[in-house]
Regions:
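Active-site-proximal beta-strand elements of phosphoester/diester hydrolases
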Residues: 2-12, 134-138
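Hydrophobic, aromatic-enriched interface-forming segments
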Residues: 111-138
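Core catalytic region of metal-dependent phosphoesterases/phosphodiesterases
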Residues: 7, 12-121
């Protein structure tokens, strides 16, 4: 029987460091076959439609998120499959919404295009976020 663990809602860089330590302590030494992040790796407030709400940059989010994923990966077995199901906050960075990031810049600021941190993101199988036509509150 295969073993897996799943978490969600890291919201880097505003995550709780004590929660991260607890997670890493509990993952270390496990014999997991799969580790799944169920969305919201990024806080995405740096790409918010609400002006001046971000206390950090998009680059700060990428740096923090990349390190978080690297820390998780470092305590898991080498054969463990890593899956990241994108959430609504992750999707907000790439949303087709000119109030967030202008369309011509969107590909340039994608986390997989950010050379400094993309190596870690690309180690994880990324499953796109699919918005419901009914909306998330229905």
């Amino acid at each position: 029987m295969e073993k897996f663990a799943a978490i969600s809602c890291i919201h880097a860089p505003v995550h709780n460091e004590s929660s991260k330590k607890w997670l890493l302590d509990h993952l270390e030494g496990t014999k997991l076959d799969h580790f799944v992040l169920l969305g919201d790796l990024f806080d995405a407030s740096a790409a918010s439609v609400h002006p001046d709400t971000a206390s950090h940059s998009l680059l700060d989010e990428y740096e923090s998120a990349s390190q978080y994923l690297k820390d998780i990966r470092s305590v898991l077995p080498k054969k463990c499959k890593l899956v990241w199901v994108l959430g609504n906050h992750d999707d907000n960075i790439q949303a087709n919404d000119e109030r967030r990031i202008p369309g011509d810049l969107r590909k340039l600021v994608h986390w997989n295009s950010c050379q400094e941190f993309s190596q870690e993101f690309l180690r994880w199988k990324q499953i796109p976020y699919i918005k419901s036509k009914a909306g998330c509150h229905q």
